[in-house]
């Protein structure tokens, strides 16, 4: 057992991912980092047996993502019976194209000598933005494009490294299927910056991250019509393209590389995808396929800042006196009197956000509209709330009571099959505890949103300062040029 531990190492530590670009003599490292997961490649325990001092260097050219694998180690275990070293190259071949296993000199020569200066990402430019004085672009292209397939096949191992339970896409499907997919590449765009490239052939682009989306057919029945069967041929003689059918757009993969995380690239990428939905009349909703916790936070932040102005514009808030619309009080939560449901549905449809996510953001916004002193975090008297309920004199206390009731109603509908198996007292306690946890989560998000607002405000001020500085510099150069011309003309004039 001790010998096995001596010859075993952590696969996440052994793999080193490096992004490189050309330099004067040989490729230069732009960034280096380790994977978060390696179990799809090296097994559930994420350990590699059979080597001492193992380093698996996985390099990618910054612009076209050409990969290269280089394995080095101090010692290799000699096979004994069934105990033999892990076949590292064999394991990686399932996740990388054949060109990744060329010799190191061949890879370095390709990076150095390849004329990458004219490289332009495939597809069309969807969005450009600046962060901390650097320029970035987001390009979108169909997966049916051969150049997109080339880039994706080179870089798809990142799905296994960073997206838990993620599956690389198949690029061998029929063209009509591939055409349902869109790939978004996020890249630095140094061609706009006043810096000299490291070599005359170097590209101005460098990978930051990417996302993939696909169209999912949306069945939208017009209930005013009575559907009738047709006797026409099947399949129909005219070509039906997926891009022309009503669809949901689903985000399948979404990745910002570790060196670029936490700086706003994810929000820019998500907002670009969302804008694509708004601009396409055939897309009905934007959905996400199995999001993880970190993506949920990003999505909540983006959607909250998209919807909040609309909620404020329409004065969306909880009606503290819903019973005024009823001749007598009912045992049910009067949702239709508490909220302007028609207006909310119109906002949701206009912004193409799927119902569950919209209800989540709406719930968060309604909590934020209640003053902090009337919420649990601000010291609200919860015992008094349980006694007074909707009869409290303070309308904000009544709003807070109804907010908790609306949230309990949503939670009960979602988990009804589990809750009905509990005793009534246990059911009430479970709902009360869950509402408290939901509220705590929203309060944490409010803090995150405030930090984001401050960061965006600082970035905007920095961009404005940079623009003003550039304008002052241009004006200064113009004045100096005019002065030089005046001095030159004066020097040619005869002296008195």
Swiss-Prot record:
Q: Where is this region: Disordered?
A: 456-496
Give me any GO biological process, just one.
subtelomeric heterochromatin formation
Does the keyword field hold Cytoplasm?
A: yes
Record's Gene3D superfamilies? 3.40.630.30, Histone acetyl transferase 1 (HAT1), N-terminal domain
Task: Give the subcellular location.
Answer: Cytoplasm; Nucleus
Binding site residues for acetyl-CoA: 254-256, 261-267
| SUPFAM superfamilies in UniProt | Acyl-CoA N-acyltransferases (Nat)
GO MF terms here are: histone H4 acetyltransferase activity
Name the cystine pairs.
Answer: none
Which Gene Ontology cellular-component terms appear in the entry? chromosome, telomeric region; cytoplasm; nucleus
Q: Which domain of life is it from?
A: Eukaryota
Give one Pfam family. Hat1_N
Question: What EC number(s) does this enzyme carry?
Answer: 2.3.1.48
In this chain, the stretch annotated as Interaction with histone H4 N-terminus covers 44-46, 214-216
Decide whether keyword Cell cycle is in the record: no
Q: Which reaction does it catalyse?
A: L-lysyl-[protein] + acetyl-CoA = N(6)-acetyl-L-lysyl-[protein] + CoA + H(+)
Q: Which family does it belong to?
A: Belongs to the HAT1 family.
What is the protein's known function?
Catalytic component of the histone acetylase B (HAT-B) complex. Acetylates 'Lys-12' of histone H4 which is required for telomeric silencing. Has intrinsic substrate specificity that modifies lysine in recognition sequence GXGKXG. Involved in DNA double-strand break repair.
| Subunit structure, as described in the record | Component of the HAT-B complex composed of at least hat1 and hat2. The HAT-B complex binds to histone H4 tail.
Q: What is this protein called?
A: Histone acetyltransferase type B catalytic subunit
Q: Which organism is it from?
A: Emericella nidulans (strain FGSC A4 / ATCC 38163 / CBS 112.46 / NRRL 194 / M139)
